[in-house]
Curated annotation (Swiss-Prot):
Gene3D superfamilies: Dihydropteroate synthase-like. SUPFAM superfamilies: Dihydropteroate synthetase-like. GO terms for molecular function: anaerobic carbon-monoxide dehydrogenase activity. The gene is cdhD1. Keywords: Methanogenesis. Heterodimer of delta and gamma chains. The ACDS complex is made up of alpha, epsilon, beta, gamma and delta chains with a probable stoichiometry of (alpha(2)epsilon(2))(4)-beta(8)-(gamma(1)delta(1))(8) (Potential). InterPro entries: Ac-CoA_synth_d_su_TIM-brl, ACDS_complex_subunit, CO_DH/Ac-CoA_synth_dsu, Dihydropteroate_synth-like_sf. This is Acetyl-CoA decarbonylase/synthase complex subunit delta 1.
C-alpha cells in the first residue's frame, strides 16, 4: 500500500537544507480530500472551514511549484470583492463659470499719452499723428485694454554706413539718399514713423555743420508724410546744436528729438523742443533712478509738459543684457502704474541694437567646437524680433528698428495681441518634419 503524505510533510523535508528550487524531479500520486461529516445538509460553518483549508492547500501548492522553479503569481490572501461603482449621471450642460477682470488696486495711475507728428489740423504737414502711452495696466492684459497700439519707426542715416549684410541688401540702392531711404521704409516696409540719424555731424566722422544737417531733415520731411524722430550722432558737445537747428527747420511738425540725456546740455534740447513744437526723448542707461532724475529736471527745470516726454531707458540686445533691459523697463512701468509721477511716460526702445550682437550678423561661431549657428539671413531678424517682443511685454511702446522682416513680424504679433488684426490659424501638426 502506498504511503500517505501531507503536503506539509513534503515542504518540511527541505527545511534547513537551503533549497531554492528542484529541477528534474517529478512527484506522482493522488490527492485525497476528506469531506467527511457533511451529514444531512449544507453547513455554512463547515463550508467556511473548507474554504479556508482549500486556500491553505493552494498556498502549499504554490510554494511547492515555486520550489520546482515554476513562476507563481498567486498564493496571497484572497482580496475582498469590490462593489461596482455607481455610474455618474451624464452631464447635459457645462458647469457655469464667469471670467471677472481683475481690479488691481495698486495700479492707480495712467501712463501719459504722448502724440508725435502734427497733421494740417494741428499746424503741421504730417499725414497722420501717432499716439503712444495711455495704458492703465501692463501690456496686453485683460485688466485694462491698451488705448494705443505699439508703433515702429525704421532707421534712416544721413550717410552710407556699414550694416549687417542681411540688413544692407534691403537698402543698398537708397543708402546715398536719406529721402529715398525714408520713402522706401514707408511705402514698401510699412513704417509707422521714420528716424533720421544725423551721424555725419560727429566731429570724428565728417563733422557736418548743423545747418547742413538740417537740410537732410527737410529732405526727409518732404519725402514722407509720417511723423519723424531726429537723432544726432551721440556726440555730447555737438548734438545740442545739431538738434536745435533740426528742430528749427521742422518747426510745427512735432518731431521727436533724440535725445536729451544727463551727460549733455539737455536744457538746450528741451528749449528747442518747446520753441519749435516738438517732443523730447529722455535717454538714460539702464538706471531707473537716473531716469527719474532726468525726467524731473526736464519737467521742473526746463518746464517740458508731460505730454511731450518719452523715455528711452536703453535697450540691451538679446545675449548682451536683454534681461537687464527687460527688468528695468518692467520696474519703470510698474512704478508708474503705482503712482510714481516721475516715470508715468511711454517708453521707446532702440531695438536696432540687436544688430550689434555678433550672433546676429556673423556667418558662424569663431569657436570650432561650437555647433552650427544656422543661416544669418534668418538668425539676424530673429535676434531683432526677440529683442523687441521681449520689451513689448515689459511695457515698451515705440520701437526703433532696421530689418523689414523684423518690423513685419513684430507688428503682426503686437497688433494681434492688441486686437487690431485677427490671427490666422497655423497648422502645427507637422512641426516635427517642417522645413524652414
Amino acid at each position: 500500500m502506498a504511503k500517505k503524505m501531507k503536503l506539509s510533510d513534503i515542504t518540511n523535508m527541505f527545511v534547513g537544507m537551503d533549497v531554492e528550487a528542484l529541477e528534474g524531479v517529478t512527484i506522482e500520486g493522488d490527492i485525497e480530500i476528506d469531506l467527511g461529516g457533511l451529514g444531512g445538509g449544507f453547513d455554512p460553518m463547515l463550508a467556511a472551514a473548507l474554504g479556508q483549508e482549500s486556500a491553505v492547500l493552494a498556498q502549499h501548492f504554490a510554494r511547492l511549484a515555486g520550489m520546482f522553479g515554476y513562476p507563481v503569481g498567486f498564493g496571497g490572501a484572497a482580496a475582498p470583492a469590490i462593489s461596482p461603482a455607481l455610474a455618474a449621471p451624464k452631464l447635459k450642460d457645462l458647469i457655469p463659470a464667469k471670467f471677472d477682470v481683475a481690479n488691481i488696486a495698486e495700479w492707480t495711475t495712467e501712463i501719459q499719452e504722448v502724440p508725435i507728428g502734427n497733421t494740417s489740423a494741428d499746424g503741421g504737414s504730417r499725414g497722420k499723428r501717432v499716439l503712444v502711452g495711455g495704458e492703465k495696466a501692463l501690456p496686453f492684459y485683460f485688466d485694462a485694454p491698451m488705448p494705443n497700439r505699439n508703433q515702429v519707426t525704421i532707421d534712416v542715416f544721413d550717410m552710407r554706413i556699414g550694416l549687417a549684410k542681411a540688413v544692407k541688401e534691403n537698402y543698398d540702392e537708397v543708402m546715398d539718399s536719406p529721402g529715398e531711404w525714408a520713402k522706401k521704409n514707408v511705402e514698401k516696409f510699412n513704417a509707422d514713423m521714420i528716424t533720421i540719424h544725423l551721424i555725419s555731424t560727429d566731429p570724428l566722422i565728417k563733422d557736418t555743420p548743423a545747418k547742413e544737417a538740417a537740410k537732410t531733415v527737410e529732405e526727409v520731411l518732404q519725402a514722407v508724410d509720417v511723423p519723424i524722430a531726429i537723432g544726432g550722432s551721440g556726440n555730447p558737445q555737438k548734438d545740442p546744436e545739431v538738434l536745435a537747428k533740426a528742430a528749427e527747420v521742422a518747426e510745427g511738425e512735432r518731431c521727436l528729438l533724440a535725445s536729451a540725456s544727463l551727460n549733455l546740455d539737455y536744457a538746450a534740447i528741451a528749449e528747442a523742443a518747446l520753441k519749435y513744437d516738438h517732443d523730447v526723448l529722455s535717454w538714460t542707461q539702464l538706471d531707473m533712478n537716473a531716469q527719474k532724475e532726468l525726467n524731473r529736471k526736464l519737467m521742473k527745470q526746463c518746464n517740458v509738459p508731460r505730454d511731450r516726454i518719452i523715455m528711452d531707458p536703453t535697450t540691451a540686445a538679446l545675449g548682451y543684457g536683454l534681461d537687464y533691459a527687460y527688468t528695468n523697463m518692467e520696474r519703470i512701468r510698474l512704478a508708474a502704474l503705482m503712482g510714481d509721477d516721475e516715470l508715468t511716460f511711454p517708453m521707446s526702445s532702440g531695438t536696432t541694437n540687436a544688430w550689434g550682437a555678433r550672433e546676429s550678423w556673423m556667418v558662424g561661431s569663431p569657436l570650432s567646437q561650437d555647433t552650427d549657428w544656422g543661416p544669418r539671413e534668418y538668425r539676424g531678424p530673429i535676434w531683432e524680433i526677440v529683442t523687441g517682443l521681449s520689451l513689448a511685454i515689459a511695457g515698451n511702446d515705440l520701437f526703433m528698428m532696421m530689418h523689414p522682416t523684423s518690423v513685419a513680424v513684430l507688428k503682426q504679433i503686437t497688433q494681434t495681441l492688441f486686437g487690431s488684426i485677427e490671427a490666422e490659424p497655423v497648422d502645427i501638426t507637422n512641426w516635427i518634419g517642417a522645413e524652414v
